[in-house]
Amino acid sequence: MAEAPDTIVLIHGLWMTPRSWEHWAERYRSKGYNVLAPAWPGMEGEVEAINADPSVLEGLDVETIVDHYQGIIGDLSSPPIIMGHSFGGGFTQILLDRGAGAAGVGLAPATVKGVRDLPLSTVRAASPLLAHPFKKYGGLDEKQFHYAFANTLSQEESDKIRDRYAVPGPAEVLREGVFANFMRHAAMSVDFENASRAPMLFIAFSEDHVVPPKPIQHMAEKYTAIPVEYKEFPGRPHFPGVAGWEEVADYALDWAAQHARTPAGVSEQTR
């Protein structure tokens, strides 16, 4: 039987940086885990630095980001638990499909090719960037961030979260996610029937405007060859760090630790 994973890799989402995991990482470290929260390539700087010079986002796409994380995971001595939020949850699915990881958790995960749902709230949340097809990157203003990330909170509370965590996002990543179903060779795609991948937990938040529960539930149902679970937390928005986050964090870790295994398809490149 495989040893229980001792490492957790946290992958942030669009319009965020590893800072968004600061409380989760601290909690998991207090439980004895080695916690890595690497940035998307080029986004290693602090939130303030990226906001001052977002040109570091130019050229980022899904394949570049996933390859980056696969390299990090491949340098570990054993497969970790991989957790991703939003696009990070989409990347988690791709990494598991490649044979990386002992278990995966997607929090409000971005959908992959084959999931046809495109709720109007998702379109509205993404429109500040999608509406400008020639933009290489773009951020969310106070009202846009409130709608997308913190709609269960007051505007004032949302502004505090935005000031601490929000950065512009690379437009190409968003386009590859939203339009995956229209791309023949979409980077945001997996083999739903891959039986060698590790188990995965799909977590949805009932009030999420960016990735509402239904698309996540439909996505989880497409995985028929591996253990998966869908869990919905009521009254929560897209941002995973609002009050009560500890319940979500503990549920995610408990599930991953209980279901973790060494994927049969792990290759030397991912070990």
Region roles according to the model:
Residues 13-16, 206:
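Active-site glycine-rich loops that stabilize anionic/oxyanionic intermediates
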Residues 29-51:
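Conserved alpha/beta-hydrolase
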Residues 83-88, 92:
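Gly/Ala-rich beta-loop-alpha elbow adjacent to hydrolase catalytic centers
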Residues 100-135, 173-182:
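Flexible "cap/lid" loop of the alpha/beta hydrolase fold
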Residues 121-168, 172:
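Helix-rich cap/lid subdomain of alpha/beta-hydrolase
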Residues 196, 202-204, 208:
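Short beta-strand/loop motif that positions the catalytic acidic residue
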Residues 209-215:
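Conserved alpha/beta-hydrolase "acid-adjacent" motif
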Residues 227-271:
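Catalytic active-site module of serine/aspartate enzymes centered on a nucleophile-bearing elbow/loop
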